[in-house]
Amino acid sequence: MMLYATSHGSYTIRFHLRLDQRIDDQKLRIALDKTAQRYPYFCVSLRRNEREFYYEMNHSPVALLHTNKAITLGALETNGHIWAVCYDQDDLFIDFFHGRSDGTGAYALIATLLYYYYYDEQDIPGIKTLDTPVSDQETHDPVDDLPLLDLSKINFPVPPKALNLMETSGLKHVGGKGLILKLMIPEDSFLPFTRSNDGTPGIMLSVLIARAIERVHPEHELPLVSNYVVNARPMLKAEDTFHNCTNRVVFHYDDRIRQMPLEKQCTIYRGKTFIQADEETIVRGMTVAGSMAQMILDLPDFSTKAAVARHAIEGTYEAASYIVSYVGKWKYPQIGRHIREFWTETPVGPFPLIEVAAVNGNIFVSFLQPFQDRRYYDALLDELKENGLEYVEYGMAPVCVADIKI
């Protein structure tokens, strides 16, 4: 659905890793070729006709480009592929078409790439290599196993419009694909604080950002609502699938929660996560999403599909004030020790999107926003300071992600 809604060509994601040494392009080329061989389902081109998008196998090498600038996937410079690797000095960039997989799927790819770059012959449990064949569980989409619903017979409640920060503050879109503000929080400062307040990194950041927005708009009238992205693979019993398997938990920061101390707020958010991310609820939500996607696929032509998908996505945008996405802590410390920084960039919608990565003892917060003004980000820094948390700022820059040519 998102694919058709963003058919203007920017539904991509860039993972920006700063490594511990200057990159050897020859070693990286070898690592990239082995990684591409391990992930044939990512080595495709995206095509479209008058009716639909579709994938086509691409046997050309995955592009390796010496640049830190934005590139175009699906174009000649990237051999028509939906992903590519760029580098500049000690900076590594993985550009990836988000319609093919989510952050969990992309992390597996990145782990394999870094494994072949740094280790190759040494066994690191859990990393997919050429010695671990692609399984049926890896390629199967669990949503295909869910029943299709007749959505015309279901009366879905319309969620109320949430507080929109741009509208409330009268801010203008900065242009391009938005801005990224980079913030690093040491784990040895953040994790004990998070645990002592009954939180997790993603939940704690969701709460702190809500409190930050309250600092700026203490008298707001529209509800302050956030979405927290969760990995649905465990609930769908499809831990190994590469397909997009995300769902969202909805947090309402209402008057009752506003009056609570931080620990109680985190407890409430944990409870909401437990209830909304249980197996039955997730399967029900993914069934609706899968049915909606199939309904769009069954529409007669491309333009109709794009219009319906865009309308559906815009409805979800109006129901949230911001989104927090946290894939989870990096699983492979042998590789993680080589990663100095880990930033995640994606085009920004009508509200802030906070992408969180945790690796090598640090939490990297990519605060993505569609406007120039820093008031909400600065309010988050005030929350960190008042709670005695350490942090390091890495500046602000335009979001630099690939377009995709179809």
Regions from the PLM with identified roles:
Residues D20-Y39, D95-A111, I180-E219, V324, ...:
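Acyl activation and transfer enzymes in specialized metabolism, enriched
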Residues M2-T6, T72-L73, T78-G80, V85-C86, ...:
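Short leucine-rich amphipathic alpha-helices used at interfaces
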Residues E77-Y119, T129-T139, A357-Y376:
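Histidine-centered acyl-transfer/condensation active-site motif
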Residues Y87-Q89, G199, E318:
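Short, well-ordered loop/turn elements at secondary-structure boundaries
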Residues M1-E52, S60-A84, R215-I406:
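Acyl-thioester-dependent acyl-group transfer interface
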Residues R100-A108, T112-P192, L384-I406:
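Non-catalytic, low-complexity flexible loops and terminal extensions
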